[in-house]
Amino acid sequence: MLESASVMQDSVIGWNEIHDDSIRYQTSSNILTFVDNLGFLYTSEFPCFGKIEVFQTKNIRLIVRTSVAMEETTCFSSHDDQNVICFPHSAFQFSKLNCTTFVSSFYSESNDRSSMFPNYISNETSAEDNSNLHDQLIGLSVDNQTVKLESSLVRLEFRHPEVDLAEAGRVCVWWDSAGLAWARAGCQFSEEESEATLTVCHCDHLTNFGVMFDYQGEADPHHPVFTLLSTILLSLSALSILVTQAFLALTK
């Protein structure tokens, strides 16, 4: 069943055939919920002795864990350890008698090709703004219930290609399944912990999370890589013109 969800997610042509945004976003949201439910359905048969199972498809990684003994923090990571989510146990009231179940999910998706999710934040930006959703999503659910954290926050790490953006260029977002939109209330971008290839977020609840780049359309247009590439291409074009002109002059 996880493989079926993976195939659906990877069907770029199929997503592009859904022209109604609300239907497309609802379908995407249903996939996220379906994957979580798969994890809890699987763990319903687990004995509670700290068992961990990992399921990996082309673009979805599902991690399920049951545990009684509580460490200070439980972390889950993507298959390449590039994306991480850490849950502080001090922020949640666990029952010593019941088995605690964690379901964590990692998604790789090319949203610029499939448009599975909106590229804007609810009530703040619009589809016309120059925003882009990072192609990695992270999800976590505990005991299949709504968890609101107060004393400590969930920590998320997203690795990505180098970006040259100010703080306004990266926003930590979470998926609002009720509104079928990205929201940022309750999530904060950590400028101190983040780097050019790393975005760190802190959030006060559990759901599916992502990162929105170039949130205000303020990306630096003079990125050194793009500048170098443009210089090389322009130089080659100029050289080609000179060679062509010389060839034409010699053949007259």
Language-model-detected regions and their locations in the chain:
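Extracellular GAIN/GPS-associated region
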Residues: 1-170
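Intrinsic disorder
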Residues: 2, 22-25, 150, 166, ...
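A generic "cationic amphipathic patch" detector
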Residues: 18, 61, 185, 213-214
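Short amphipathic alpha-helical surface micro-motifs
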Residues: 121, 136-140, 180-184, 191-192, ...
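Homeobox/homeodomain signature
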Residues: 128-130, 177, 219
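Proteolytic-maturation and junctional protease-sensitive modules
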Residues: 147-212
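Hydrophobic alpha-helical transmembrane segments corresponding to the first two to three helices
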Residues: 193, 202-207, 211-252
